[in-house]
Structures are given as C-alpha cells and as structure tokens.
Regions:
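Charged boundary/loop elements
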Residues: 1-32
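Short glycine-rich loop/turn motifs that provide flexible caps or phosphate-binding loops at active sites
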Residues: 1, 7, 84, 88, ...
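Conserved polymerase palm-domain catalytic core
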Residues: 25-139, 148-150, 159-162
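Residues in well-ordered beta-strands of folded domains
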Residues: 2-4, 74, 160, 173
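Hydrophobic helix-cap positions at the C-terminus of alpha-helices
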Residues: 19-23, 108, 144
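Short, conserved micro-motifs composed of acidic
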Residues: 143, 153-181
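Low-complexity, intrinsically disordered short peptide segments enriched in small/polar/basic residues
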Residues: 10, 105, 116, 131, ...
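Short, glycine/acidic-rich hinge or "gate" loops at secondary-structure transitions
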Residues: 1-6, 116-118, 154
Length: 181
C-alpha cells in the first residue's frame, strides 16, 4: 500500500472505514491491528540478505557489504555491536524491512483467502475477517514471525470487535478497542 501511488496509504484507511460500516454489529467479524516489537531494529539480517538476493540481486552486493558484519555503535566509551535490524537513517531501511515481511504477508493471504482485508504499511498491519480466521492469522504471526525477527508486541496489538457474541480467543493483554470510539 502507498508505493508510487499518490495518497496510496489512505486507501487502507478508507477500506477499513467502509468495512466497519458494512459489517456493523456482525458478531462474526473482527479487526486486528498488528504491532511488532521494535520492528525495524529486530529484523533478521540473514533473512533480509536472502530476500535481497532473491528479489533484488542488483542490490545484493551493496546490502551485503552494509549488513553482513555487525556495525559498531559508540555509546560513550562503550562500543556496541549491532547485529540485527536495519540501520537507523538507512534510506533502504523501509525497503529492506518490507522484503522481510513480504513472505509472511503472502503466506497469510495464501492460507486465509477469505479474509476481508489484509493490508500492511511497513510494520503496521490491519487484518479483518471472521473471528476464527483472524485468530489463526494472529497465531501464524506469533509462530512464523520470530524466525524473521518479527515479534508481536501483544500489548500494543488492538482488536476492534463490533459485537462480542463469540468467545474471545485472544490473549488478555491484547487491547480491546471500545466500539463507541
């Protein structure tokens, strides 16, 4: 969403609003807003390099040069080794992060073709569908994300549930957004 399209990111906002109107109080529908912990700083560099090699081979040597060895970070008299994530300020950072996330997003779409919406803007995801499917997507992300350095920040994920007639399968620390606002 939003790449090379003026106002492209807003399309997901409008889609969410429209789906919320359409589903109204349907107890079988739910929306999950996904949040990853420290997303850009935690992506697995081995996975990132593999994705660059596969998808953007012309950039591979440069990205490998920049990310195949730990970067030295100076903190006072201490030198820290940065071994994960993309470097702050790297103009390729959003692209590299997206390359790591993309296979997970494709897996979600393949395994859950009946989702009403599955949209990502960098590390922000919005998933709308049946309670059962969205819960299974949540579990898939928890299971498959860490191998890519994508760890759900469960306390910052949000659920919007128009009507809670169904049992709630999500962990208690996932935030429930009040339907009133």
């Amino acid at each position: 969403v939003g790449v090379a399209t003026p106002g492209g990111a807003e399309a997901s906002v409008h889609a969410v609003r429209q789906l919320a109107k359409e589903f109204g109080d349907d107890p079988g529908k739910i929306m999950l807003k996904v949040d990853f912990s420290n997303a850009f700083n935690m992506v697995d560099r081995t996975e990132m390099l593999a994705q660059v090699y596969e998808k953007l081979p012309s950039l591979y040597r440069w990205v490998e040069y920049c990310y195949s060895n730990p970067a030295h970070l100076f903190f006072g008299s201490c030198v820290l080794q940065s071994v994960a994530g993309v470097q702050q300020g790297d103009p390729l950072g959003p692209l590299l992060f997206s390359l790591v996330l993309h296979p997970l997003a494709l897996k979600i779409e393949a395994e859950f073709p009946n989702l009403d919406l599955c949209v990502w803007y960098l590390d922000d995801g919005t998933i709308i569908g049946s309670v059962e499917d969205v819960h299974k997507v949540f579990e898939l992300i928890q299971r498959d994300g860490p191998a890519r350095g994508l760890h759900l920040n469960v306390k910052k994920n949000e659920i919007w549930w128009p009507s809670r007639a169904s049992p709630d399968p999500f962990p208690a620390d996932v935030d429930r957004v009040d339907n009133a606002g």
